Regions:
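Membrane-proximal intracellular helices of multi-pass ion channels
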Residues: 1-456
């Protein structure tokens, strides 16, 4: 009877659209995580944590953002930190990828339904080879996170001893690879995030490597693995690599130029340390959320540059957020094609479909609108500058996690807005809209005449 009940309970999910199922399961994971973080055992004080704070933390972890209301290292006990780390790993890889691990362990066959959800979650256009892709993702993730944890373990070992060094290595490796930005080092008086290690090349370059690898995307991994020569890679992979390289080194150059003599950021460092800190800032803005200096000390122009880099984010099908590198690339290519009076958008001797151009434009406009509205709300509700409110809003919507220091003082309404933004940012506005608002695609029976409108 009990088995029959659960079978009936799961029947609606078997006929549900993959996009809608992904949204609902992510919501369930967040609520479950919030419930666990509310438990007295989750906090160092042994007292229950308020539900809104727990919900904010669980959403930030599952959506791999990194914004926090309470310090992760000092507020949460080991149980709470383990819950946060599990939420980061599930959110970074996707619940279906994690579920496949159990399918493999139990030697169960992955059916068509599961393949459909996996394809939607990973941004794949094909169901064939999806199981093989998941296997490669799990193996690659374990190898990269393991290597990062090992390097950080040996770096932390002389400073913290075996137990803490092992935990710090594992936690920060997973957090960096998943582009989450959570850290548990604050109980060692580091001054917040990775500020203590601003001049440490081992920590800086290890974290940067993990962030970049996690932000490239699983599809790019596979393409690079099978085609070591750049010319043989797909147009998408080449576009991702080119845009990522330009943004990282271009952003680093801009930050170095703007902040070179700023005493609150790079001013007190040696020239080589300034370049490393500028490079780290450019990388971490790609939705990672670690910081090696106070973000509130950035100049106004630097904050504007940071806003743009946060908006762009990482690549599709990765652990990163933002509107994605290729989305911005397609919009810029479309603008260039229009300026040259071309009727189609072309790149590397290939033509980009008009629907892809329309989707990219729509997504970018939606993110800009939501960022502006959210910033206005935070500025009015919490009496903070519009500049800092915009920084916080973009950081939440693009799942970055960097803050100018206003997160812990936000009112309940602003916290809820950021929770919604983090949720939208991780799952994607398109995924949520298609999953819940779009009707089933039907053949258009009526074709209307075109009309001319003036633009520009």
């Amino acid at each position: 009877m009990l088995l029959s009940f659960f079978q009936r309970l799961g029947r609606p999910f078997r006929t549900m659209r993959p996009g809608r199922l992904i949204v609902l399961v992510f919501l369930f994971i967040i609520l479950l995580g919030a419930g666990l973080l509310c438990l007295p055992a989750a906090s160092r004080s042994g007292e229950p944590t308020p539900f809104l704070t727990s919900l904010f933390t669980a959403t930030s972890a599952t959506c791999v953002t990194g914004l926090i209301r309470v310090d992760t290292g000092t507020h949460w006990a080991m149980f709470g930190q383990v819950v946060i780390l599990l939420l980061i790993q599930i959110g970074g890889l996707g619940f279906m990828t994690i579920a496949c691990l159990f399918f493999f362990a139990l030697r169960r066959k992955i059916g068509l339904r599961e393949r459909m959800v996996l394809a939607q979650a990973l941004g794949s256009d094909s169901y064939s080879g999806i199981v093989s892709l998941v296997r490669n993702i799990l193996r690659g993730t374990a190898a990269v996170e393991g290597a990062g944890a090992l390097i950080l373990f040996f770096r932390f070992l002389p400073e913290f001893g075996f137990g803490k060094a092992l935990w710090y290595g594992v936690f920060h490796s997973i957090s960096a690879f998943c582009n989450a930005g959570f850290d548990v080092l604050a109980d060692t008086d580091v001054g917040g995030s990775l500020c203590r290690y601003a001049t440490d090349p081992v920590v800086n370059f290890t974290i940067m490597a993990l962030i970049i690898i996690g932000g490239l995307g699983f599809a790019v991994w596979g393409d690079i693995r099978h085609n070591l020569r750049f010319s043989r890679m797909s147009v998408y992979t080449r576009l991702v690599i080119l845009i990522t390289t330009v943004l990282i080194f271009g952003g680093a150059g801009i930050f170095a130029a703007l902040e070179w003599n700023n005493p609150g950021t790079l001013g007190g460092l040696t020239p080589s340390q300034k370049l490393m800190a500028a490079l780290f800032q450019s990388v971490t803005l790609r939705t990672a959320g670690f910081a090696t200096f106070d973000q509130n000390a950035l100049s106004d122009v630097s904050k504007a540059v940071a806003d743009f880099l946060m908006l762009v984010g990482g690549s599709s099908g990765s652990t990163a957020g933002g509107v994605k590198t290729v989305t911005v690339g397609v919009i810029l290519l479309a603008a260039w094609s229009t300026a040259r009076s071309r009727t189609s958008v072309q790149i590397m001797k290939r033509r980009i479909p008009q629907q892809a151009v329309a989707n990219a434009s729509a997504l970018f406009i939606l993110v800009l609108l939501l960022s502006g509205l959210g910033a206005a709300f935070l500025s009015i509700a919490d009496h903070v500058s519009l500049e800092n409110a915009l920084y916080e809003t973009i950081s939440a919507l693009c799942t970055v996690g960097l803050t100018t220091g206003i997160t812990s003082s936000l009112c309940a309404a602003s916290q809820i807005v950021l929770i919604i933004f983090m949720f939208f940012g991780r799952l994607g506005i398109m995924t949520i809209s298609v999953g819940f608002m779009a009707a089933d695609r039907a053949e258009e029976r009526v074709s209307y005449a075109e009309t001319k409108i003036m633009i520009g």
